[in-house]
Amino acid sequence: MQYKIKNAVQIKKFSDYYKITVCKNITKGKKSTKFVPKGKGGNNKKLSNSISRSKKQVLEKALCNEWLWFATLTLDPKKYVRDDLKTFIKDLGQFIRDQRKKYKDVKIKYLLIPELHADGKNWHLHGLFSDIPIADIEPHPLKKLSEKGYINWVTYQDQFGFNSLGAVKDPVKCSMYITKYISKDLDKAVTALDQKLYYCSRGLKTAEIVAQGRLTQPINFKMAFEGLYSKSQFVDDYEFFKCYYIDDKF
């Protein structure tokens, strides 16, 4: 049987940060089975939940792991059919496995999100890499990019096409930024192709729940994000927040 918990608090540890989240209501317990007719409303809710869930997963993986490079990976039409996302992902996965075998001391991990070009047909990828073999990189051949510190992954260019990698300078801002690529349009596009909203290495770290409970008094400060149903904020330490809630395992 389902039941609601008001003013629920959850605190998660993200590597060097903590995220405090307060929800007006959360639903716990087993949902009773009932008939729900198919229709536009149900599909829209399912779509919204898929996007929200994927954004949270990407943010967790981005914040809980160490990344050196923000990457944009494209396809050269002379080398690949640019609208074939399935083949792109499959071959890129094999390419990365080959790189790991060749450079065994380089731990290549990735978190990538597909995006359609403005033409609504062809694909490229944005995302994060933990490391790239030094022997395989060079200053970017485009002057406007090399002047900003971007590099070129030479072996990727040889097999796939244009790419650019920039150093991750602010992990939190970069992690927040990449979630913007997960959108309603992307969900529809990848669903039609039976593909995913994002791709990542196995074994990436995720956030750990370190505390949860219920508010015991109103919060007397504004949190960084405040929506209709929840509010949240990243902090270095949550000791100051302990006076606002009581522990509860739900």
Language-model features, listed with the residues they occupy:
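Right-hand nucleic-acid polymerase module
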Residues: 1-121, 132-250
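Cys/His-coordinated zinc-finger cores
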Residues: 125-129
